[in-house]
Design a protein with these regions (language model features):
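N-terminal beta1-alpha1 cap of cysteine-dependent amidohydrolase-like domains
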Residues: 1-96, 220-280
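Short, glycine/charged-enriched secondary-structure capping and boundary segments
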Residues: 18-21, 80-83, 114-118, 169-170, ...
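Structural motif
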Residues: 58, 93, 102, 163-164, ...
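Short glycine-/acidic-enriched loop or helix-start segments at secondary-structure transitions
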Residues: 15-16, 77-79, 111-113, 166, ...
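Pocket-forming structural segment of enzyme catalytic cores
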Residues: 8, 116-209
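A glycine-centered loop/beta-turn motif at secondary-structure junctions
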Residues: 180-226, 232-241, 245, 253
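A structural signal for short, well-ordered beta-strand segments and their strand-loop junctions
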Residues: 5, 42-44, 101-103, 173, ...
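Cysteine-nucleophile active-site neighborhood
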Residues: 71-139
Length: 280
């Protein structure tokens, strides 16, 4: 099966991720895909780069599915050519009926292209771990959440949120910080399943992302100092390397829904099962 992975992070952001030792967003999705379909064929498209040629409709149709990692652009910045390039891809994929899946920015761009709205979350940034995500009544019976606990935590990093859902879209999950944590968007000839949180992240990658966002997080009051931040990072990375550290897991509030791939990645696995392998 052939998958197109759209990494929308600008080159400057990708270089920063390299500097802090974080895996690039497109590569993270590729890694997650290979865990479940080892022989998958992948193409990673760096869509924000001016040198990258966008696929037309006929090229898109050569792919079985399209994957959307997170991105640090803003979907409602209509004057940003990089955003418009990716809006065009989403719309073409809907038109072609190619199944799409993604996280964070993916949920926002799926809703936005279908006619919904996205805005800055008045509560500010939801960072690190999204606590007590719960399935809506629709989510409890949706195939994306087959086998998922009704309440769980997820890795997260965003300050925008979906505010208005378009016709043909459903809310699958929510929490107290962000009312729309997962969506199923049916539009034109296609569907797009997406989470606001990140099934593809693990504890190490989230720790590295916090390092990449160090200045913002400190200025926004998440840490009193860089030293406080590094103490927290050390706890997270120790848990990643020693997952049986009960003391540190208790201190940081890290449970199996964050540590175990078979729980954390279940939304993606179910998308593969029901949308790609047609187990309907």
């Amino acid at each position: 099966m052939k998958f197109l992975i759209i990494d929308g992070y600008p080159e400057k952001s990708r270089l920063q991720f390299d500097t802090v030792g974080m895996t690039l967003a497109g590569k993270l999705y590729e890694k997650m895909l290979f865990q479940h379909i080892p022989d998958a064929e992948t193409t990673i498209l760096y869509a924000s780069d001016n040198s990258t040629l966008l696929p037309n409709l006929e090229v898109l149709k050569t792919f079985d599915g399209i994957l959307w990692p997170g991105c640090n652009l803003t979907v409602y910045h209509d004057d940003d050519e990089r955003v418009q390039r990716m809006i065009e891809i989403v719309d073409l994929a809907f038109e072609a009926g190619i199944p799409q899946f993604g996280s964070c920015w993916a949920a926002q761009i799926a809703v936005y292209v279908a006619g919904g709205k996205v805005a800055l979350n008045p509560k500010g940034r939801e960072m690190g771990v999204a606590r007590k995500i719960y399935l809506t009544d629709t989510g409890k019976s949706h195939p994306m959440y087959e086998g998922k606990p009704p309440v769980f935590d997820g890795f997260i990093s965003h300050d925008d949120e979906i505010t208005v859902m378009p016709e043909g879209a459903t809310i699958l999950a929510s929490n107290d910080f962000t009312s729309i944590q997962a969506v199923d968007v049916a539009y034109k000839n296609g569907s797009f399943w997406a989470t606001q949180y990140h099934p593809e992240y693990d504890l190490k990658e989230m720790a590295r992302l916090i390092v990449a966002r160090a200045d913002k997080l400190t200025s926004e009051g998440y840490f009193n100092s860089q030293d406080d931040m590094m103490n927290y990072i050390n706890i997270l990375e120790t848990i990643a390397n020693e997952p049986n550290r009960k003391d540190l897991r208790w201190m940081a509030g890290i449970d199996d829904d964050l540590l175990k791939d078979n729980i954390r990645q279940l939304e993606f696995v179910n998308w593969l099962k029901f949308e790609m392998l047609n187990d309907k």
